Amino acid sequence: MAPEPTANGESEIFATALRAHLSETRFAFTGLTGKEATRSITRAVAEWSMASGWRTRCEAPMRYIDPPRLQTGGCRGYWSPPWCAYLDLRLRRKDGPPIAVEIDRSDDSTAVDKLRDEALRGRPALWIRWHGALRAEVPAGVARLHLPTRSSTSPVRYSRAPVTDTASITLGADVTPEARAEALNRDQQRKAEEKRAAARPQAPGPIRC
Protein backbone atom coordinates (compact mmCIF):
# COMPACT_ATOMS: atom_id res chain seq x y z
CA MET A 1 0.00 0.00 0.00
CA ALA A 2 1.38 3.43 -0.91
CA PRO A 3 2.10 5.69 2.06
CA GLU A 4 -0.22 8.62 2.70
CA PRO A 5 1.29 11.93 1.51
CA THR A 6 2.69 14.12 4.25
CA ALA A 7 1.44 17.68 4.73
CA ASN A 8 4.56 18.82 2.86
CA GLY A 9 3.70 16.57 -0.07
CA GLU A 10 0.05 17.61 0.01
CA SER A 11 0.99 21.31 -0.18
CA GLU A 12 2.88 20.60 -3.40
CA ILE A 13 0.09 18.39 -4.75
CA PHE A 14 -2.54 21.06 -4.15
CA ALA A 15 -0.39 23.88 -5.55
CA THR A 16 0.09 21.80 -8.71
CA ALA A 17 -3.63 21.01 -8.89
CA LEU A 18 -4.56 24.68 -8.47
CA ARG A 19 -2.10 25.69 -11.17
CA ALA A 20 -3.65 23.10 -13.51
CA HIS A 21 -7.15 24.42 -12.74
CA LEU A 22 -6.12 28.02 -13.45
CA SER A 23 -4.47 26.89 -16.69
CA GLU A 24 -7.48 24.86 -17.83
CA THR A 25 -9.89 27.72 -17.08
CA ARG A 26 -7.57 30.25 -18.76
CA PHE A 27 -7.58 32.44 -15.66
CA ALA A 28 -6.54 36.01 -16.48
CA PHE A 29 -7.54 39.60 -15.76
CA THR A 30 -6.95 43.06 -17.24
CA GLY A 31 -6.98 46.57 -15.83
CA LEU A 32 -7.89 45.71 -12.22
CA THR A 33 -7.01 47.60 -9.08
CA GLY A 34 -5.02 45.75 -6.40
CA LYS A 35 -8.15 44.91 -4.41
CA GLU A 36 -10.01 43.81 -7.52
CA ALA A 37 -7.13 41.56 -8.60
CA THR A 38 -6.98 39.96 -5.15
CA ARG A 39 -10.74 39.35 -5.23
CA SER A 40 -10.44 37.83 -8.71
CA ILE A 41 -7.75 35.39 -7.56
CA THR A 42 -9.77 34.61 -4.43
CA ARG A 43 -12.83 33.75 -6.53
CA ALA A 44 -10.73 31.51 -8.77
CA VAL A 45 -9.39 29.59 -5.77
CA ALA A 46 -12.91 29.29 -4.32
CA GLU A 47 -14.14 27.90 -7.66
CA TRP A 48 -11.33 25.33 -7.63
CA SER A 49 -12.30 24.40 -4.07
CA MET A 50 -15.95 23.97 -5.04
CA ALA A 51 -15.01 21.90 -8.10
CA SER A 52 -12.98 19.67 -5.76
CA GLY A 53 -16.00 19.13 -3.51
CA TRP A 54 -14.65 21.18 -0.60
CA ARG A 55 -16.19 23.91 1.53
CA THR A 56 -14.57 27.33 1.46
CA ARG A 57 -14.41 29.84 4.27
CA CYS A 58 -13.07 33.36 3.73
CA GLU A 59 -11.32 35.25 6.54
CA ALA A 60 -11.08 32.06 8.58
CA PRO A 61 -9.84 32.62 12.14
CA MET A 62 -6.58 30.98 13.14
CA ARG A 63 -4.25 31.10 16.12
CA TYR A 64 -0.51 31.59 16.10
CA ILE A 65 1.37 28.81 17.85
CA ASP A 66 3.52 30.99 20.08
CA PRO A 67 1.60 32.83 22.79
CA PRO A 68 1.64 36.62 22.59
CA ARG A 69 3.65 38.77 24.94
CA LEU A 70 2.71 42.28 26.01
CA GLN A 71 5.13 44.68 24.34
CA THR A 72 5.58 48.41 24.77
CA GLY A 73 6.10 50.85 21.95
CA GLY A 74 6.28 54.51 22.90
CA CYS A 75 3.09 55.25 24.83
CA ARG A 76 1.27 52.13 23.69
CA GLY A 77 1.05 48.57 24.90
CA TYR A 78 0.34 45.83 22.38
CA TRP A 79 0.34 42.06 22.05
CA SER A 80 2.88 40.42 19.75
CA PRO A 81 2.03 38.22 17.98
CA PRO A 82 -1.62 39.28 18.17
CA TRP A 83 -4.11 37.08 19.97
CA CYS A 84 -5.93 36.23 16.77
CA ALA A 85 -5.40 36.30 13.01
CA TYR A 86 -7.31 35.35 9.89
CA LEU A 87 -6.46 33.22 6.87
CA ASP A 88 -7.62 34.53 3.50
CA LEU A 89 -9.18 31.13 2.80
CA ARG A 90 -9.59 27.82 4.58
CA LEU A 91 -10.63 24.93 2.35
CA ARG A 92 -12.32 22.16 4.32
CA ARG A 93 -12.15 18.58 3.05
CA LYS A 94 -13.93 15.47 4.24
CA ASP A 95 -10.88 13.25 3.84
CA GLY A 96 -8.09 15.30 5.40
CA PRO A 97 -7.09 18.39 7.34
CA PRO A 98 -8.16 21.77 5.96
CA ILE A 99 -5.97 23.62 3.48
CA ALA A 100 -4.72 27.07 4.52
CA VAL A 101 -4.48 29.66 1.74
CA GLU A 102 -2.99 33.15 1.75
CA ILE A 103 -3.16 35.51 -1.25
CA ASP A 104 -0.73 38.43 -1.34
CA ARG A 105 0.54 41.11 -3.68
CA SER A 106 3.86 41.43 -1.84
CA ASP A 107 6.05 39.70 0.73
CA ASP A 108 5.31 42.41 3.32
CA SER A 109 2.51 40.57 5.08
CA THR A 110 1.83 38.11 7.88
CA ALA A 111 1.25 35.26 5.41
CA VAL A 112 4.62 33.67 6.15
CA ASP A 113 3.92 33.42 9.89
CA LYS A 114 0.34 32.17 9.48
CA LEU A 115 1.17 29.52 6.89
CA ARG A 116 4.26 28.41 8.82
CA ASP A 117 2.14 27.69 11.88
CA GLU A 118 -0.58 25.93 9.89
CA ALA A 119 2.06 23.71 8.27
CA LEU A 120 3.57 22.92 11.66
CA ARG A 121 0.12 21.72 12.74
CA GLY A 122 0.18 19.24 9.86
CA ARG A 123 -2.11 21.17 7.52
CA PRO A 124 -1.37 21.77 3.82
CA ALA A 125 -0.49 25.44 3.25
CA LEU A 126 -0.61 27.38 -0.04
CA TRP A 127 0.79 30.86 -0.57
CA ILE A 128 -0.41 32.54 -3.75
CA ARG A 129 1.93 35.45 -4.47
CA TRP A 130 1.04 37.73 -7.33
CA HIS A 131 2.97 40.69 -8.70
CA GLY A 132 6.41 41.87 -7.63
CA ALA A 133 9.71 40.18 -6.92
CA LEU A 134 9.92 37.22 -4.54
CA ARG A 135 12.13 37.98 -1.56
CA ALA A 136 10.70 36.11 1.42
CA GLU A 137 11.83 32.56 2.11
CA VAL A 138 9.10 29.94 1.85
CA PRO A 139 8.44 28.39 5.28
CA ALA A 140 8.80 24.67 5.85
CA GLY A 141 5.76 22.71 4.71
CA VAL A 142 4.45 25.55 2.52
CA ALA A 143 4.07 25.68 -1.29
CA ARG A 144 4.14 29.07 -3.03
CA LEU A 145 2.47 29.57 -6.41
CA HIS A 146 3.75 32.71 -8.14
CA LEU A 147 1.40 34.60 -10.47
CA PRO A 148 3.36 37.57 -11.85
CA THR A 149 1.41 40.48 -13.32
CA ARG A 150 2.01 43.62 -15.34
CA SER A 151 1.10 47.02 -13.92
CA SER A 152 0.39 50.46 -15.31
CA THR A 153 0.79 53.81 -13.59
CA SER A 154 -1.53 56.77 -12.96
CA PRO A 155 -3.78 55.06 -12.05
CA VAL A 156 -2.17 51.77 -11.07
CA ARG A 157 -3.89 48.83 -12.74
CA TYR A 158 -2.84 45.19 -12.91
CA SER A 159 -3.12 42.69 -15.73
CA ARG A 160 -2.45 38.97 -15.79
CA ALA A 161 -2.02 36.81 -18.90
CA PRO A 162 -3.67 33.36 -18.85
CA VAL A 163 -1.95 31.02 -16.39
CA THR A 164 0.10 28.22 -17.92
CA ASP A 165 1.16 24.88 -16.50
CA THR A 166 4.68 26.27 -16.09
CA ALA A 167 3.72 28.87 -13.48
CA SER A 168 6.38 28.85 -10.78
CA ILE A 169 5.87 26.74 -7.65
CA THR A 170 8.41 27.01 -4.84
CA LEU A 171 8.47 24.58 -1.92
CA GLY A 172 9.67 25.08 1.61
CA ALA A 173 11.75 22.48 3.37
CA ASP A 174 10.13 19.44 4.96
CA VAL A 175 8.64 19.85 8.42
CA THR A 176 10.52 17.39 10.59
CA PRO A 177 8.68 15.25 13.16
CA GLU A 178 10.76 16.93 15.88
CA ALA A 179 9.76 20.43 14.73
CA ARG A 180 6.10 19.44 14.57
CA ALA A 181 6.16 17.85 18.03
CA GLU A 182 7.83 20.92 19.51
CA ALA A 183 5.33 23.23 17.79
CA LEU A 184 2.34 21.21 19.00
CA ASN A 185 3.72 21.38 22.52
CA ARG A 186 4.01 25.17 22.25
CA ASP A 187 0.49 25.24 20.83
CA GLN A 188 -0.84 23.48 23.93
CA GLN A 189 1.03 25.95 26.11
CA ARG A 190 -0.60 28.81 24.23
CA LYS A 191 -4.07 27.34 24.75
CA ALA A 192 -3.36 27.09 28.46
CA GLU A 193 -2.16 30.70 28.49
CA GLU A 194 -5.37 31.78 26.76
CA LYS A 195 -7.45 30.07 29.44
CA ARG A 196 -5.44 31.76 32.18
CA ALA A 197 -5.78 35.14 30.46
CA ALA A 198 -9.55 34.67 30.08
CA ALA A 199 -9.85 33.91 33.79
CA ARG A 200 -8.00 37.05 34.87
CA PRO A 201 -9.82 40.36 35.46
CA GLN A 202 -9.96 42.54 32.36
CA ALA A 203 -6.97 44.84 32.15
CA PRO A 204 -7.41 48.48 31.08
CA GLY A 205 -6.83 49.32 27.43
CA PRO A 206 -3.52 50.54 25.97
CA ILE A 207 -2.05 53.63 27.56
CA ARG A 208 -2.23 56.67 25.30
CA CYS A 209 -0.20 59.85 25.71
Model regions: which residues?
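Generic detector of low-complexity/intrinsically disordered segments
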Residues: 72, 91-93, 128, 173, ...
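Domain-level recognition of nuclease-like catalytic cores that cleave nucleotide substrates
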Residues: 130-209
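Nuclease catalytic cores
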Residues: 2-46
